[in-house]
């Protein structure tokens, strides 16, 4: 008996185990691995801010946020929901099941002028199942976040060279489409 639905699962081997550049389908991603911690930073090679400090545009001084200061963005619950939805939908249900309860980190770098997503990067370890997720999944998340997400920069956010928003998520995955009624697979 064949399964009724087939869908992509995680790769059998670790994809992101050492510092490497990946060129796939017209886009280039950089995977940086810290040899000691095995911590992975995965990002579009075109990114320019991944390792840049957040600074005040006027002074060049490094920005150090605090819980009691004015907001860098105006919170928008529908945008936060949309971020989670985009991540969930990029993973198949089979992938999500294989990931178990483990989370990975998604970081968006926003324009201080428009609040739109300029860059995205991902963090996980070489020994987590996220190191076996195909590159096109991370690419889909990046593209959709850039297309669909924007926040209103706050008073402080407007003064910075970029705004960083980061969160950890355990993807739920999407179900594959059902076959048309009456068809047999």
What feature does the model see in each segment?
Residues 2-185:
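Charge-biased low-complexity segments
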């Amino acid at each position: 008996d064949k399964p009724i639905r087939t869908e992509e699962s995680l790769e059998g081997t670790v994809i992101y185990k050492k510092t490497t550049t990946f060129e796939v389908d017209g886009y280039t991603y950089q995977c940086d691995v810290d040899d000691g911690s095995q911590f992975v930073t995965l990002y579009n090679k075109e990114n320019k801010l991944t390792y840049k400090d957040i600074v005040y545009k006027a002074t060049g001084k490094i920005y150090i946020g605090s819980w009691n200061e004015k907001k860098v963005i105006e919170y928008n619950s529908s945008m936060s929901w949309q971020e989670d939805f985009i991540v969930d939908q990029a993973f198949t249900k089979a992938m999500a099941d294989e990931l178990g309860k483990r989370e990975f980190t998604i970081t968006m770098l926003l324009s201080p002028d428009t609040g739109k997503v300029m860059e995205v990067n991902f963090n996980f370890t070489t020994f987590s199942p996220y190191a076996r997720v195909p590159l096109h999944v991370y690419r889909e998340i990046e593209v959709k976040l850039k297309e669909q997400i924007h926040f209103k920069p706050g008073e402080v956010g407007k003064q910075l060279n970029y705004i960083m928003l980061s969160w950890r998520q355990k993807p739920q995955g999407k179900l594959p489409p059902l076959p048309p009624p009456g068809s047999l697979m």
